[in-house]
Amino acid sequence: MHKFICTWGAILALGVTFPAAAHDRARTPVRVPDLPGFVTLKCDFHTHTVFSDGKVWPDIRAEEAWREGLDAIAITDHIEHQPHKNDLPTAHNRSYEIARGHGEALQLLVIPGSEITRSMPPGHLNAIFLQDARKLDVPDWREAVAEARRQGAFIFYNHPGWRGQQPDGRARWYPEHDELLAKDQLHGVEVVNEREYYPEAHAWCLEKNLTMLSNSDIHNPIGLDYDLHLGDRRPLTLAFARERSRQAIREALFARRTVVLAGNRLVGREEHVRPLFERSLRILTPQVRIRGTGRAYVQIHNESDIPYQLRITGSDPDLAFPQELRLPAGRVALLEVRGRGKDREGRRMVQVSCQVTNVLVRPETPLAATLEFEVTLSPQP
């Protein structure tokens, strides 16, 4: 018994060998292809800390993002809403300063920002790439926005369908937003905030030439809102930048080179989502052979972390395809192709028309795409 106790005590002393005692500080990359001439940066431009109504210290925001595979975050604590002011002094720049220090150690880009928090209209606006957030702490919301623009900020309309200001959950555009747009004081809209997708905001971005954004608006520790260990992920803005830098992200935002990645859905302009989809896939068997009414399998490798759901819309006089095809993230899927006749022969290229149902180029409008491969048909003996 004494020997057992001693042995067990020695094991406990080396508790690092137990999985429950181990805690890896490790990064999980988000695999998304780059576009020609650009690097795809994974960003979250709406986060909060204890310096407004968030629940975590600013450096935690930086490490959370680094662990999740992000390239950049903006710290956007509220200007007007300071529920912790009895415990922490109001210091509008301090959360960014703290987060940036840890971000630099992790090679994570941290961007200074603030949330201008007013009643509707105009509602809540994020201003990022600020020089001094303290100057936005003024009574008149118009002056706060004007000051942000004088500092060179990129300004966007937050959660336009948030039920705290829109009880029916419907996003609305007001004359005040037209006013800001005319003054070059509004540049984008959150098409997704947390887990909410706003189709109205998606349409505004196309109609009014605004940048599409997708952000977490995180207040809690990230693990309380997202089941990271199950593959759950915060919403991200994919920014197509010329290089990995704050200035390049700013340029990409003003140029509207973004795509929304939220859950398993992509939302964006066709010029961006099409190459993103196409560069995610690699056909491993570009040539197949079919005898008569036999079958062949086209192997398609989805090299990204974005699963795709395809609805086959095209038809072929010689070949039959399934109605739907799923391309799981990081895996190889099979497209089954069957011959329609026993006596068909020849070799030709086949283009299978489809809709990528979880990639939206407009509200309720999926991306139209094609899968291409070569087939050789021979008669059935």
Region roles according to the model:
Residues T7-T17:
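Bacterial N-terminal signal peptides
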Residues F18-A22:
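Sec/Tat signal peptide C-region and signal peptidase I cleavage site
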Residues H2, H23-C43, A62, M120-Q131, ...:
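Charged catalytic cores and adjacent phosphate/nucleic-acid-binding surfaces used
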Residues E80-H81, R163-G164, H219-I222:
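Short gly/pro/ser/thr-enriched loop/turn and capping motifs at secondary-structure boundaries
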